[in-house]
Amino acid sequence: MEDRSHKVLLALVMLFLFAVIVLQYVCPGTECQLLRLRALSPAAAADPYRAEDETPARFVPRFNFSAGDLLRRVDFNIKGDDLIVFLHIQKTGGTTFGRHLVRNIQLEQPCECRAGQKKCTCHRPGKRETWLFSRFSTGWSCGLHADWTELTNCVPSVVDSKKEVRLRPSRNFYYITILRDPVSRYLSEWRHVQRGATWKASLHVCDGRSPTTEELPSCYTGDDWSGCSLQEFMDCPYNLANNRQVRMLSDLSLVGCYNLSVMPEEQRNKVLLDSAKENLKRMAFFGLTEFQRKTQYLFEKTFNMNFISPFTQYNSTRASSVEIDEQTQQRIEALNFLDMELYDYAKDLFLQRYQYMRQKEHQEARRKRQEQRKILRAKQAHLREQGENSSSTDYLGNVERWR
């Protein structure tokens, strides 16, 4: 019995070796489809953008956007007068993205960043003026973490004098920003405040003035709010962390700035949310912290500027280390219900833009391949025609000699 099993095993080994020899003979090299199965496997062919941030394989859009809303390609003239303006919302990953802008872009004249200095010099090629308005290039020129209302009213006057405005009417301001999941962002801000951050230097200018203490009371009485518990953080009704992303992206002039008595709360919330959605949609670009590689891809396609090193998805943050129960999670979502709705809208628009741009990219690649095949076929036809003409000439010459 044992001898028989040895014979069977030997036969199987011989059969396997024979199959390998036949395969190599019938299909040598690496061009055989059978040998390419591994290369075509899902693991090897996985989309790097999907693998990086674990996007679901099938994204189903919820909102209807026009082709104009989805296609974002701006003619950014870095050698001219165009300016990229970065709206930096607290605890959205804006610091990381801001560093990418000054240290990680392939430029004819790279930004000059010196050790120990917070700001980099980002001049246009051959000029002594900046192409980037951000924390790491111009500093907080319009106030600490200036919002949409502040930036749109401040940037033009800071960048240009009245005389320059008349001389340069064609300057384009391209606003960009980064958003983050509201619960993660809120927890991150709480941890930051708990460590002593205040952002007291923020101006909150709207309609030409900062809010009064009655319009914007403080959540604490001392120099800062260090050591505050999450419960205390959530209990303050004036906490600017609540719905921060909607507030910083909307036109506050539409609701009377920080004066809550101008209109009913429900109406105010709707106006703010609608304004934030519209401003976000009309921005030249926005990215999402949860999708680093896609953020990089869309920025590169939008501005035709390439980063040197790929973005990295960091899933371990101070916010992710905070363990909260379901009740606390629901409380945070309720406090940030406008941000939750804005983020759903932004995520849908972001992923639709990504899909649209990838489709355009694939269509363009297919068109180029078709053009190349067309040119190749034309060359082959031309060569065949030349060969036929040559054969015909040789034949006629022989006929003449035979006579």
Swiss-Prot record:
Listed GO biological process terms: limb development
InterPro entries, sorted: Heparan_SO4-6-sulfoTrfase (IPR010635), P-loop_NTPase (IPR027417), Sulfotransferase (IPR005331)
GO CC terms: membrane
Region annotation (Disordered) ranges: 381-403
Record's bilayer topology term: Single-pass type II membrane protein
Enzyme class: transferase
Family: Belongs to the sulfotransferase 6 family.
Name this protein carries in UniProt: Heparan-sulfate 6-O-sulfotransferase 2
Annotated organism of origin: Gallus gallus (Chicken)
